[in-house]
Amino acid sequence: MLDIRFPARVRGLTCGLAALLMAFATAPVLAADAPALAFPGAQGAAAHTPGGRGGKIVRVTTLAADGPGSFKEAVTGKGPRIVVFEVGGVIDLGMKELRISEPFLTIAGQTAPHPGVTIIKGGLTIATHDVVIRHLRIRPGDGGLPKRSGDIDAITTVRGAHDVIVDHCSLTWATDENLSASSTRFHGENEAEWMANASRRITYSNNIVSEGLADSIHAKGEHSKGSLIHDHVNEVLIVGNLYAHNYERSPLFKGGARGQVINNLIYNPGQRAIHYNLIAEEWRGHPYSKGEMVVRGNVMRAGKSTEPLAFLMIGGSGDLDVYAQDNLIVDRVGKTSIQETGSYTTAPVKLNRVKNAPALPFGVSLLPAAKVQDAVIENVGATPWNRDLIDRRIVADVIEGRGEIIDSQDQVGGYPQYKETRKLFVDSEWNLDVMEPKSGSYPRGEPLR
């Protein structure tokens, strides 16, 4: 498990008046000043976002795409809010993206009755701050549309989004990226303003990011992509995720992007796994910003669709500072013959190797790469305690070394058709500050057949 564990609270000293005064002067002040975590095990710069804590409870009571009691009504509402589910099954968004524009939101997919909530034919765009999304499945797919007719991310942020966590979600079949942090490249007058106005303080943890559709409906053609971290996006943490069957971008950092990629399992990438690319044409008239990447304790395993590649590649025209340490990179038979770094550019770029390890992001307990595969497989996805058939198949592909990059969800069984289920949400059964069940276990049901 990648979730951290916190020490027991400080015990007061009782030996004499001086010790008692010392305890009052120090320990209680530290405890009072410590901000609450978004949820137990939250990591990164966004770990202390309140999300919707203290706001109204908004119940999703229908699987309809919109209207009273719908998911759309809940997430597009105003004010601090915690979205809970009294219905399980499939929500069809009709090839539309929902835009979250109001801050202080927690989406608690873990509250849904078995088999949980799966959103199909659509995705989420986060255009605000202090948002926590947990335990959802989002599977956009091609919707039966003709090729080159459009594109949808499963989840993405846009310019100005900050303090966002996407944790324990299953994101597949996107026709743009499965999970991205996007932005406007140059919003402001200088690099400091570009950074401040970009998406920032983002944590993507413990997600399945898989099967981006390749030759599908994206206008550019091939577009099986894992995660795009856009130009100038910063303070990003990508930790404990499973990237499987994506042709590229597991993840891609664009020009000037800065963040850490830690303890992820990347299986069956196509022509690129992790890469960095500042595209000169997009930066015309602007000075180049240097990118920064920390890449530690990750695993990359080649699969059927993997082409000749290096684990970490640099393209384009901008320089990159990188600290890479303890990354395990193997081919299909377990040989460590794949090189760690490479390039797909002839521009005079510099890959500057940082010698001293940067500080780990808040809450991260770094695992050695040799332990990452088992830890990720055990913990990853929307409902690791009872995965749906699609997640089970993807995880089985990783375990067995099979599967390939796909062009349509129809190649792997198509959209799910789970029956609607219902269960009232009872406030008293949950710790509403962190949206964890007081019983210690999430809703379960009979295994899906």
What is each model feature region?
Residues 1-10:
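N-terminal secretory signal peptides that target proteins for export/translocation
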Residues 92-235:
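Right-handed parallel beta-helix
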Residues 338-449:
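C-terminal functional modules
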